């Protein structure tokens, strides 16, 4: 793809890991991205507080390069409370109380694999091993859940899934809840494993369909079957 000087300048301003930047270039130069960039600029001009901090917006992609991805855990949008969101789906900064969904995830992990329940909710260790912790929408206004939906992020993360779908094989996609499952309809089930369950939020999980889903052991079993190093799900103390 031959780029103009203007396009190269636009790409240089995107703080994104190189393998992702190369693969997502058509989208990064699309009208969707222009519109999204304008929206975020307007939000900052209006002095809105946006989570996560700008340097962490692309954390999921920056920590887990394209050729390192083994697993994708798809979330909806970032936590909207202070100091929570760190750019990884379901993850929170160290020192922040565990959100209810993450408590339930840790409970299921303990039941499934006997992994001790972590006292902190920073999932960076998973991301560093190849777990792409991807929200569908990558930003949110403080205290306003879902406030940045339908501004272009959904199309961006669809493009991320399409790149993985087309360029990689034997990835495990973990889709909790109807929202993630709808977004995951584009995944080729002949090349990849798709695991579905209810959402880990208390409202959904307590209705049934999340506890006992055993996605962590099923993920590692599939990876091992395909000669891929399994994930060490235990977080550091």
Swiss-Prot record:
Gene Ontology molecular-function annotations: uracil DNA N-glycosylase activity
A GO CC term assigned to this protein in UniProt: cytoplasm
Keywords assigned: Cytoplasm, DNA damage, DNA repair, Hydrolase
Source organism superkingdom: Bacteria
Coarse class of the protein's main subcellular location: cytoplasm
Subcellular location: Cytoplasm
Documented EC number(s): 3.2.2.27
Substrates-to-products reaction catalysed: Hydrolyzes single-stranded DNA or mismatched double-stranded DNA and polynucleotides, releasing free uracil
GO biological process, one term: base-excision repair, AP site formation via deaminated base removal
Annotated active site: 77 (proton acceptor)
UniProt family annotation: Belongs to the uracil-DNA glycosylase (UDG) superfamily. UNG family.
Protein role: Excises uracil residues from the DNA which can arise as a result of misincorporation of dUMP residues by DNA polymerase or due to deamination of cytosine.
Name of the molecule in the record: Uracil-DNA glycosylase
Gene of this entry: ung
């Amino acid at each position: 793809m031959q780029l103009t000087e203007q396009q190269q300048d636009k790409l240089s301003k995107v703080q994104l890991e190189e393998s992702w930047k190369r693969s997502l270039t058509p989208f990064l130069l699309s009208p969707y991205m222009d519109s999204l960039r304008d929206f975020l600029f307007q939000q900052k001009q209006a002095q809105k507080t946006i989570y996560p901090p700008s340097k962490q917006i692309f954390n999921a992609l920056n920590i887990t390069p394209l050729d390192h991805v083994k697993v994708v855990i798809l979330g909806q949008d970032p936590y909207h409370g202070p100091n929570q969101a760190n750019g990884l789906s379901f993850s929170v900064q160290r020192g922040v109380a565990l959100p209810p969904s993450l408590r339930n995830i840790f409970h299921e992990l303990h039941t499934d694999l006997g992994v001790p329940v972590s006292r902190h909710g920073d999932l960076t260790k998973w991301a560093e091993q190849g777990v792409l912790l991807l929200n569908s929408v990558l930003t949110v206004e403080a205290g306003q859940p879902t406030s940045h939906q339908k501004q272009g992020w959904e199309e961006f993360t669809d493009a991320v899934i399409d790149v993985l779908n087309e360029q990689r094989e034997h990835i495990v996609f973990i889709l909790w809840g109807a929202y993630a499952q709808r977004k995951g309809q584009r995944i080729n089930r002949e090349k990849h494993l798709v695991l579905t369950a209810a959402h880990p939020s208390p409202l959904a999980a307590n209705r049934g369909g999340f506890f006992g889903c055993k996605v962590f052991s099923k993920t590692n079993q599939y990876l091992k079957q395909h000669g891929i190093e399994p994930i060490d799900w235990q977080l550091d103390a």
